[in-house]
Every structure is written in C-alpha cells, then in structure tokens.
C-alpha cells in the first residue's frame, strides 16, 4: 500500500528517536493520526518550543532555558567546591536521584574517541581547563561511564586536574546490590576487588 508523502515524512521523522525502527515509527504515526490528534499537536508544539528555546548552560553545559542553570546558580552548591563530571545531561538526573551529591556539574556531551575523531576540544575539555583555572573547584568527581572510552576520558581529565592541583576521584563501580558473583563479568569483578573498602 502506498502511503501519503506527509505520512512517510512523519514516520521517517519519528525514526530519529533511539530504538525506533520502521515498524515502531509506523505504529506511533498511525496511533497519533487515528486516536490522538490532540496529543500529536501538543507533542509538535512542545518539540518545536524545546528545540528553539532549550540551550546549554554557559557554566556546566547541561540543558537549560536560561544562560546559566539553576544548579550552577545555587549558592550552596557553589560553596561546596565539588564538581561532578558526567557524559550527558541524563547522568545529572541519575546522580541527583541518589541525593548524595550537593556540588556542581560539568557535562562532556560525550567521551574521548580518537577512532571516531572525537578529541578533547570536542567534549569541552578546553572549557573544563578554564573552569579549573578559576580556582573555585576544590574536588572533582569523575562519573564517566565504565566503558573503555569512559575510562580513557576519566584518565585524561585526572591528568588535567593534577596540572591544576585539584584532587580528582573516580566513582566506584563493581558488583551491583543483589547481584550474584558467578553472574558478574570478570572486568566488573576485577574493579570490585581493586576498589574494595576496609570494614575495620
């Protein structure tokens, strides 16, 4: 069956979302047109407004409608002197959900990947260098993903922190709560053993 040009365009546009293939895009498009046109209009308006009005914080690079985000403007967070470095704005949401961090953030918007042509300036490390040079950051917590690229990025940033004499630590990663050792991969178990904590 030949579909209309506008319908094809809608389905193709929906495929830009992660995990959405041709069938999922078709299902979404048909649902909006058959059962929820009002929701579709609201979605279109919200997307249009978000795309035009949401930018990056001038301090930490997370998403915000203002020049500087609320976290960076918070005096208590400024006073803590702590900075948590993450790969994406979604990681900020995850860290905030723990309730264990009360400092500021710096979002890389990715990680170092020389094979893909992604170098230090592509993930804002020149801006991070400038931030560290200001002298108001007393400790850096590296919360990049536990991948080869994430580890390489953390190592690079740790060296940058050393140049500025700012203490840097890496978040622990290892055996998950409720996990069984026999099901944990060797690399994760190695990190758990190396990052063990004394009980007494």
From Swiss-Prot:
A zinc finger (C4-type) spans 57-72. One of its GO terms (biological process) is DNA repair. Keywords: DNA damage, DNA recombination, DNA repair, Metal-binding, Zinc, Zinc-finger. It comes from the Bacteria. Residues 81-176 form the Toprim domain. HAMAP family: RecR (MF_00017). May play a role in DNA repair. It seems to be involved in an RecBC-independent recombinational process of DNA repair. It may act with RecF and RecO. Belongs to the RecR family. This is Recombination protein RecR. It comes from Aliivibrio fischeri (strain ATCC 700601 / ES114) (Vibrio fischeri).
